[in-house]
């Protein structure tokens, strides 16, 4: 999905998060056109300590950046998966049903906002909630990720057995 219509609002929301966290912000592009979105966000927020990870990172490098973060403001499903696997608390801006379904499986729906309701004020309130519940979220994410990881491995084994039967 192209988020160019939301860029100015995203920038305002990122500034709100930056004011709360008082930490450098790193934008991790997970699809090719996200890099240009990151550049536009940086242009809109020249006063922020906002960095853009290289656009050609592999999945492992992206996961390592997220793993070493204290908080994720996430939109893309893969960034949410990386944060969940590493126990990094996050607030999700929901743009697609697949993201909603992932949050349900993680029991993290309360830490999300539908894209059409995203405002700096709403983001501030949700970030406060995530920060207040940080320890519980870390415990929850680690537990849910372990369960979902086992389900993924079982599914993989089923697919591999079906493929090997047809060969």
Model-derived segments and spans:
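Active-site anion-handling motifs in enzyme catalytic cores
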Residues: 1-167
């Amino acid at each position: 999905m192209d988020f160019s219509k939301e860029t100015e609002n995203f920038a305002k929301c990122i500034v709100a998060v930056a004011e709360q966290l008082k930490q450098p912000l790193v934008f991790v592009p997970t699809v090719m056109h996200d890099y240009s979105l990151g550049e536009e966000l940086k242009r809109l927020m020249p006063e922020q300590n906002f960095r853009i990870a290289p656009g050609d990172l592999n999945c492992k490098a992206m996961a390592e950046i997220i793993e070493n973060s204290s908080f994720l403001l996430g939109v893309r499903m893969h960034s949410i998966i990386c944060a969940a696997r590493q126990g990094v608390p996050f607030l999700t801006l929901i743009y697609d049903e697949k993201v909603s379904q992932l949050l349900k499986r993680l029991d993290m729906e309360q830490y999300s906002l539908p894209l059409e309701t995203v405002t700096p004020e709403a983001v501030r309130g949700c970030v406060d909630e995530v920060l207040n519940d940080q320890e519980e979220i870390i415990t929850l994410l680690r537990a849910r990720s372990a369960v979902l990881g086992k389900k993924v491995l079982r599914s993989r084994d089923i697919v591999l057995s079906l493929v090997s039967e047809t060969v």
